[in-house]
Amino acid sequence: MNRLNIAVSCLATALLFGCEALHPPAPGDNPDYAPTYPVTPDPKELRKVSGAIYSSETALPLFETPRARHPGDILTVFLIEKTDAQKNATTTQRKNDTTKITNKLFLGRPISLGSGYSMDFDLDNQRQFNGEGRSIQNNKLAGSISVTVAKVLANGNMVVQGEKWVRINQGNEFVRLSGIVRPQDIKADNTITSDRIANARISYGGTGQINNTNAQGWLSRILWGPLFPT
């Protein structure tokens, strides 16, 4: 019965990994990166008469900034992400224990075990551990993506989100971005760099044959997973 339970557990784990591989990302599958469209005003609201000469609903400003500031406006983000991380760890432990017991005297004479053997003896214990670890990681992401303003917060900051898909031969490459933007950080040409976005979520990946070639199969992921004994 135990062997049957183990076999069923392994099969269920394999199926989970397999299902994950069968559902790669697709355009529009995540609402967190879906575009936001401008809200069309209700004609009934525009026809309301308040008695004043000026109406904010039908006002046409003479001068207006081209920067994104309303839900549905488009903002271009230049990706300049670069991270360099390096970590070194060295551990050395050493312990030496030495114990010496001298022969005792009895009636002024050393105690003997016979045949000339003395009770003098030494105990020497040495333990040593050396450990060393090193990790180096470099990441760089450059490019651009246009996103839309999803929401304007009470303090004027804007929540932006969007994705870009590019099909190259037999595969797709995508960039997804979401975060919070300050209006002061938007340049005059309606662009902003990714390092000025708060709470940024940037994803870059791909689907297709090339991406599948660079990924491990479901059985390899099980064998190299943390649950498999080394």
Curated annotation (Swiss-Prot):
Among PROSITE patterns, the record links this protein to:
PROKAR_LIPOPROTEIN
User: How is this protein situated with respect to the membrane?
Assistant: Lipid-anchor
Write the signal peptide boundaries: 1-18
> Main subcellular localization, coarse class?
membrane
* Presence of keyword Zinc: no
Task: Say which domain of life the source belongs to.
Answer: Bacteria
Q: Which InterPro entries match?
A: Flag_Lring (IPR000527)
**Which keywords accompany this UniProt record?**
Bacterial flagellum, Cell outer membrane, Lipoprotein, Membrane, Palmitate, Signal
Please state where this protein is localized: Cell outer membrane; Bacterial flagellum basal body
- Which residues form the lipid moiety-binding region (N-palmitoyl cysteine)? 19
Assembly mode: The basal body constitutes a major portion of the flagellar organelle and consists of four rings (L,P,S, and M) mounted on a central rod.
Q: Which family does it belong to?
A: Belongs to the FlgH family.
Described purpose of this protein according to its UniProt entry: Assembles around the rod to form the L-ring and probably protects the motor/basal body from shearing forces during rotation.
Q: What is this protein called?
A: Flagellar L-ring protein
Organism whose genome encodes this protein: Legionella pneumophila (strain Lens)
